[in-house]
Amino acid sequence: LMDNIGNTFSAKTITDFLKNQGRKLSAETVYNYLRALESAFLIHKAVRFDIKGKRILETQEKYYLSDLGLRHAVIGYRDNDIAGVLENIVYLELLRRGWTVHIGKQDVAEVDFVANRTDERLYIQVCYVLTPENTEREFDPLEGNSDNDDKLVLTTDTLPRTIRDILRTHPTGSFSFEPSVYWRLH
């Protein structure tokens, strides 16, 4: 769980892994452990939300850690996990600001967060660094959503040049860009 922040969760994957290690554990037992971790406020569960169907889905949830320091203590710090860590930070910040947070499903694509608060809805994509290779993956799920709710791309990019290049590629007025550091400080 700590090694997979930002990824969808499957109890079957856990039970299959343990079975290969010579241990037997049911999916229900895995979920019991997860509920216990949630009750102890060590993890938070984000369920999937079908954006087109406007309904909660029962599978492929994600779990985020309440304290990333625990993760670093258990598995160590890894530079290559920074994208998942950033996603975890954004999730916790949305909760702190009073949003109810889901992960979004838009056809076959994923929107990192669908955040709801009273009459507001906000769609958020979190990306460590926007590159020509990942720009389409980050923007397409937001562009495929035709409602008028706010859409935000959070990235660690801070150079205005980067944002201008992206706007040239995706010339739409429906997106906000904000360096994640500044967004976190609001």
Q: Which stretches of residues belong to each language-model region?
A:
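Arginine/glycine-rich "motif VI" loop of SF2 helicases in the C-terminal RecA-like domain
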Residues: 140-149
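Accessory nucleic acid-recognition modules appended to NTPase machines
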Residues: 1-121
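Active-site-adjacent loop/helix micro-motif of nuclease/hydrolase catalytic cores
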Residues: 130-140
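Short active-site-adjacent structural elements
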Residues: 111-112, 132-134, 160-163
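Domain-level recognition of nuclease-like catalytic cores that cleave nucleotide substrates
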Residues: 158-186
